[in-house]
Swiss-Prot record:
Listed GO CC annotations: cytosolic large ribosomal subunit
SUPFAM superfamilies listed in its UniProt record: Ribosomal protein L14 (SSF50193)
UniProt subunit comment: Part of the 50S ribosomal subunit. Forms a cluster with proteins L3 and L19. In the 70S ribosome, L14 and L19 interact and together make contacts with the 16S rRNA in bridges B5 and B8.
Species name: Ureaplasma parvum serovar 3 (strain ATCC 700970)
Name listed for the protein in its UniProt record: Large ribosomal subunit protein uL14
Lineage: Bacteria, Bacillati, Mycoplasmatota, Mycoplasmoidales, Mycoplasmoidaceae
Top-level taxon of the source organism: Bacteria
Length: 122
């Protein structure tokens, strides 16, 4: 469960390494984000020669969470970390590579470009 002030790892090559959640988008008082949800983030740590600088704001989609995801088959999936991918306004990834596995719910929510760039879809 991702909420306001949660720190996330960035799983792409935009240059941002860690971000903090400012707002969970969707609904008037939506508190928690799960895999596939969009959040507004602020870059907390970044590499010097990246597309994104420290302090910049961006939108991101959650790709991995420590909180388990329950599927219709009864299967529970959880990851070792909370991670996101920075996206543009048209919901395409800002980076050209994605690191680590992503949940299948990403593809189901319509982020096919992120799912195709990921090395593994669980």
């Amino acid at each position: 469960m991702i909420q306001h002030m949660t720190r996330l790892k960035v799983a792409d090559n935009t240059g941002a390494k860690e971000v903090g959640v400012i707002k969970v988008l969707g609904g008037s008082k939506k508190r928690y984000a799960s895999v596939g949800d969009i959040v507004v983030v602020s870059v907390k740590k970044a590499t010097p020669a990246g597309l994104i600088a420290k302090g910049q704001m961006a939108k991101a989609v959650i790709v991995r969470t420590k909180k388990s995801i329950r599927r219709e088959s009864g299967l529970l999936i959880r990851f070792d970390e909370n991670a996101c991918v920075l996206i543009k306004e048209d919901k395409t990834p800002r980076g050209s590579r994605i690191f680590g596995p992503v949940a299948r719910e990403i593809r189901d929510r319509g982020y096919t470009k992120i799912a195709s760039l990921a090395p593994e879809v669980l």
